[in-house]
Curated annotation (Swiss-Prot):
Species of provenance: Chlorobium luteolum (strain DSM 273 / BCRC 81028 / 2530) (Pelodictyon luteolum)
Stated name of the protein: 1-(5-phosphoribosyl)-5-[(5-phosphoribosylamino)methylideneamino] imidazole-4-carboxamide isomerase
One GO cellular component term noted in the UniProt record for this chain: cytoplasm
Family in the record: Belongs to the HisA/HisF family.
This enzyme's EC code(s): 5.3.1.16
């Protein structure tokens, strides 16, 4: 199972929210690039980046910060947050982003997905479904869609989408355990590749999710649990290494 660290960017800083609530925002680092380098040094094979400002406003205000991360690292980066047009997608993919995550637009403008699938390979476009009790939430989780989560997934599958990033909002940022049953139900009904997200707290959560590979769950995005050092290996790195060097020319970075 592929483990993907998450980086959320708000006002240019690396933050984490609790259940998507912007009033419950915690800043972890002022420079998201430094955070990306830390995760890469801890053996990340992919990063998941969300532009929270873009999700709120539709303006890609953190585009250059994301570009820095993409150019600096030697691993794929997937990006979501406020991507609402084919031009937005093209800007990110032309810049070198590995894949783009379509969120609310999959509900509000499904023709965008159809258009994208005519232009890009399925590996470049994924859809994020964030749900509460099986109902997708859109527009920063402020509105509910008029269909079930698995129904939305099946519509996307019919358009050529092969992967869904599925977030159980009730668990997101709570550090109270992954939404195992909701993820299992969704994956079984969707019949697609699924990246699980929301609530992963410890190694036991990862073991449980690994048991869902039979229904397509092959990867997981981890946010707050990493930032709060919930995994023993992180304590080793932080306590016994002589500091994590944030030299942007570390050995795995691309040479400029």
């Amino acid at each position: 199972m592929l483990i993907i660290p998450a980086i959320d960017i708000k006002d240019g800083k690396c933050v984490r929210l609790t259940r998507g609530d912007f009033s419950q925002q915690k800043i972890y680092l002022d420079n998201p690039l430094d955070m990306a380098i830390i995760w890469r040094k801890q053996n990340a094979k992919m990063l998941h980046i969300v532009d929270l400002d873009a999700a709120l406003t539709g303006e890609m205000v953190n585009f250059e910060r994301i570009r820095q991360i993409v150019e600096e690292l030697d691993i794929p980066v997937q990006v979501g947050g406020g991507i609402r047009s084919a031009d937005d997608v093209k800007r990110y993919l032309d810049m070198g982003v590995g894949r783009v995550v379509i969120g609310s637009a999959a509900v509000t403008n499904p023709e965008l997905v159809r258009e994208l699938m005519k232009t890009w390979r399925a590996s470049k476009i994924v859809v994020g479904i964030d749900a509460v009790n099986g109902v997708p939430k859109i527009k920063g989780w402020t509105e509910s869609a008029n269909l079930k989560d698995f129904e939305l997934a099946q519509r996307m599958k019919d358009m050529g989408i092969e992967r869904i990033i599925y977030t159980d909002i009730t668990r997101d940022g709570m550090l109270q355990g992954v939404g195992y049953e909701t993820t299992r139900r969704f994956a079984e009904l969707a019949g697609m590749k699924v990246t699980a997200s929301g609530g992963v707290t410890n190694s036991e959560d990862l073991r449980r999710l690994a048991g869902l590979q039979y229904c397509g769950v092959d990867s997981v995005i981890i946010g707050k649990a990493f930032y709060e050092c919930n995994f023993p290996c992180q304590e080793l790195w932080y306590n016994f290494e002589e500091g994590i060097c944030l030299d942007h020319n570390f050995s795995t970075a691309r040479k400029r």
